Amino acid sequence: MTKSKANENIIIERNYSKKALRNRIIIGTATLGIVRVEWAQARYAQVIPCNWSSAGANIGFCHTYPLNYLVAEAQNVIIQSAVEQDYEWVFFLEDDVILPANAFLILNEYMKKGDIPVVSGLYYLKSQPSEPLVYRGRGNSCYDKFKLGDKVWVDGVPTGCLLIHRSIFKLMWDESPEYTVSMQKVVRKVFETPARVWTDPETNTQLCAAGTSDLFWCDRIMREKVLERAGWKKLAKQRYPFLVDTNLFCRHIDINTGLQYPMK
């Protein structure tokens, strides 16, 4: 009887290690298929946190690379994968954003704490002089009153190095209309590149408006009170509800020339 009990304990211990992997994070990169070797080196030479591995033990770790989509379309394909496969976090990494070597370590800390649902890295425009893609307000240029190492609260973040919690993207997915993207794939319009043309009835003047999918998404979160309805009531009360961690300082590379910004 004692021997049988001992064997039973061994079996239980062995089976415990074989339980289903947690679908912790999915990394999505929208790309046309060509990336710089500098990007690939930074992406695949990342320091991997313990027990946080694509081949590994208890935490699932997946990658998806939607090819030949427009940016917003690709982002919606990535979100669809995250929703359908039940991932806890989405990490958008664009194919011209070069991560620091410790990026996954930084992300892992936010994932473990789980107290901030939207976290962006810091990177700059591909221009000279360059400006940080950090925003407080609309129509008033960038926000640059920070030093490297600061954690900056903002109301607008880019999607080139962006971590999003499931509570946010799942709620938005559930409430977004379906539409068909390239290759007849049906997704939902969580992200959208705003572009519209209309005629002012008073002046009979034709007007147009356009923007980027990242700021449009940030505006939608605030306009539709997504944070509050997803359970982030304290953050929802903040004027600037999204975090930019400048420790996650990335380079923005020109795929054609290899120039990296900022250049100084």
Residue ranges and their predicted role:
Residues 2-15, 20-21, 178-264:
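C-terminal catalytic/acceptor-binding lobe
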Residues 87, 114-116, 240:
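Short, high-confidence coil segments that cap the C-terminus of an alpha-helix
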Residues 1-65:
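N-proximal low-complexity "stem/linker" segments adjacent to membrane-targeting elements
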Residues 87-98:
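Short beta-strand-to-loop acidic/aromatic patch adjacent to the donor-nucleotide binding site
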Residues 67-74, 211:
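A short, glycine-/small-residue-rich helix N-cap motif at loop->alpha-helix starts
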Residues 60, 88-90, 117:
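Conserved acidic residues
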Residues 77-89:
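Active-site nucleotide-sugar/metal-binding loop of Leloir-type enzymes
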Residues 79, 100-193:
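Conserved catalytic core of nucleotide-sugar-dependent glycosyltransferases
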